Regions:
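Short alpha-helix
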Residues: 181-196, 202
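A short glycine-rich, Lys/Arg-flanked "PGG" loop and its adjoining helix->strand segment in the class I
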Residues: 140-155
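Conserved class I S-adenosyl-L-methionine
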Residues: 1-56, 153-180
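A short acidic, Gly/Pro-enriched loop at the edge of an enzyme's catalytic core
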Residues: 119-126
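A short SAM/SAH-binding and catalytic strip from SAM-dependent methyltransferases
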Residues: 126-138
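Conserved Class I S-adenosyl-L-methionine
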Residues: 200-258
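Class I SAM-dependent methyltransferase SAM/SAH-binding core
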Residues: 63, 69-116
Length: 258
């Protein structure tokens, strides 16, 4: 019988770009513009931030996994006064550190991939991880390490469907490629059930900020679709006819550590 964790891994594998498409790509498609991870002066509240904040003691600590600029951490400072960021890119940790100075919090950073660096990462009152889980095939050790580093609560934010789903029409139009419809956020609850972790999932909506935060957002989409620069005009025309939605469906999955 296939476990929920095995299904999660196999479903994610369906999202691999076919080799023949990837091999012809002039530019690597898996780019993350730093502008996407900049945080505003005033962070809009969300259900994810609320669930993290309500478990945070005054003056407590938050550990942000795959932190980027740290929106998951700085949204709850205060009441948190100490932030810890984990990221694979030093550029993101530098951004996280600079933001800590702006928000007036003490800061620690850990360079590396989660959960490989978990043992060298401090424990915190609340652990947050925003928009990372859909990149993780080996999901059980990832979740177990989150649980082990939280004193009070773990809060995970993910889109309801795979984050690349908003480009499915583009893949069909330019490559006649049908993209998967699995996994979905609720599948993580099944994995957590298998781990004997009693978690709650709640749904809400949030903004899509790609075109607002990234100069040349259409070029970003072109690269994600493995198309060369000379086809940018076709991309621009396609996006004009099929604009990205302004809102997206999100889920927050959280549990209190026993």
């Amino acid at each position: 019988m296939v476990t929920a964790a095995e299904k999660w891994k196999s479903d994610l594998a369906l999202w691999a770009i076919p080799k023949e498409i990837l091999d012809q790509a002039v530019e690597k498609p898996w780019i993350h513009p730093p502008a996407l991870f900049e945080i505003p002066e005033v962070i809009k509240d969300s259900l994810s931030h609320q669930r993290a904040r309500e478990a945070m003691p005054i003056g407590g600590s938050v550990l942000d996994i795959g932190c980027g600029g740290g929106i998951g951490a700085f949204a709850i400072t205060p009441p948190a006064s100490h932030v810890i960021g984990v990221d694979e890119q030093q550029e993101m940790l530098d951004l996280f550190t600079n933001n800590a100075a702006k928000f007036g919090t003490s800061v620690e950073t850990v360079l590396g991939q989660w959960p490989a660096v978990a043992d060298s990462t401090p424990v915190a009152d609340v652990v947050t991880v925003h928009h990372v889980a859909f990149n993780v095939g080996e999901i059980v050790p990832f979740l177990a390490a989150l649980n082990a580093r939280a004193r009070k609560r773990v809060v995970i934010e993910v889109p309801v469907v795979h984050p690349m789903s908003n480009m499915n029409d583009g893949w069909k139009h330019f490559w006649n490629l049908i993209r998967p419809t699995v996994p979905v956020a609720g599948d993580l609850i099944n994995v957590l059930d298998e781990m004997d972790i009693e978690a709650t999932i709640e749904y809400f909506e949030g903004e899509i900020l790609l075109d607002k935060k990234v100069d040349g957002a259409n070029g970003f989409i072109r690269r994600r679709l493995c198309l060369p620069e000379e086809r940018q005009g076709e991309i621009d025309a396609f996006i004009a006819a099929h604009p990205l939605p302004e809102r997206r469906h999100l889920a927050v999955i959280w549990w209190d550590v026993q």
